[in-house]
Amino acid sequence: MMRRIHHVGIVVKRLTDAYAFYRDVLGLPLLREAEVADQGVRAALLAAGESEVELLEPLGAATPVGRFLARRGEGLHHLCFETPDVAASLTDLHARGVPVLDTQPRAGLAGRIGFLHPSACSGVLVELATPTASHGEEPSPLRLKRLVIGSEDVRATAGIFQSLFGFTEVAMNGGSRKMLAVGRGTLLVVPAREVGGIAGMVALSFVAEDFLALTAALRRAGIPRLDGTGEVTVEPAASHGVYLHISRYMFP
């Protein structure tokens, strides 16, 4: 059973530069920062409602995250689900023939963690984590609303996440999209043709506790954006490669 989206990982060139946007402009509280030597990163977790945002700075160009940065630039890297027993989850998935990168959990910034191979989840790199300590939800001006995933076969991709992790489908008004509930957040699987042909993680959506205060902060900082009545879209150049939507409302 997956309890929630624990975090979404974002590769950045420098943590200090990313803090200037995610912590100082958006107001996401910094929970912890540490060097994770076996992953070749310096990482930080910031609170976003029941979920978190993980920023990943490579320690060198030859590390996996360093190669990702050189190949793709800054942007979305992985998706992490919280499970009550990461060892049991990895064992179960491995026994079912699911490709995994870790058959046993190891230490990570999120607790005891393990990764599945991207081929297991339609090209999305998925991490499973069991936090080593229970933390209450940190107050934050933004809550993670959903992660958007592009797919050439929406039904198949949604079915994989349902089969592997037991997520339930959220009813939508027809169409070719599929939405899955994960804790209080959602995954939205959309046709790749609707998102520039991108297959994999495409965009993050947050809901603001005080939408007017948030838009004022973006305006003061001179952040390039598209303002709407109930949503603001931040240009990826300002949000370290992430298509970022911030809404006034939790639904739809």
What are these regions (language model features)?
Residues 140-189:
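A mid-sequence, solvent-exposed acidic-amphipathic segment
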Residues 1-19, 76-83, 129-158, 201-204, ...:
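N-terminal beta-strand motif that seeds the catalytic metal site of vicinal oxygen chelate
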Residues 90-143, 179-182, 186-188, 215-252:
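Vicinal oxygen chelate
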Residues 54-58, 80-84, 92, 96, ...:
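A structural feature that tracks compact, well-ordered secondary-structure segments
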Residues 45-50, 62-79, 87-110, 117-120:
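Active-site-adjacent scaffolding segments
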Residues 18-23, 93, 157-162, 218:
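Conserved active-site tyrosine of GNAT-family acetyltransferases
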Residues 1-9, 15-47, 54-57:
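An N-terminus-focused feature that recognizes amino-terminal "leader" regions
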Residues 172-215:
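Intrinsically disordered, low-complexity segments enriched in Gly and acidic/Ser/Thr residues
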